[in-house]
């Protein structure tokens, strides 16, 4: 097992929970990162941490990105009247804030890769992959997508 970690964006849901042991079985030391962009119920953050450690993560980090999401995306989009497909407020941009926090943590830990649990369907995989590639040179692992291919 490598001593430098792979940093996994971790929600505690089914897909990212699968990724922890899957990555460990393939020789990765896994550090999970939950980027809290707001909206968690009391105790939920602790439950996410407990889940990550139960699954074998060597460490779990929670990053508070609520203020960054508000300042960088919500306020400007609401003030600018931005709409997704001219229908509803464009407020699904937390992936970019998550990526920024994930990369900061990965770099501070000397990580060898970053990973996410996005599937091969939908826009999340593109948001994560393109955002990650635009701000760091680390390999991007997507175990769920890879096993679906």
Sequence positions of predicted segments:
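ATP-dependent adenylation/nucleotidyltransferase module used to activate substrates
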Residues: 1-149
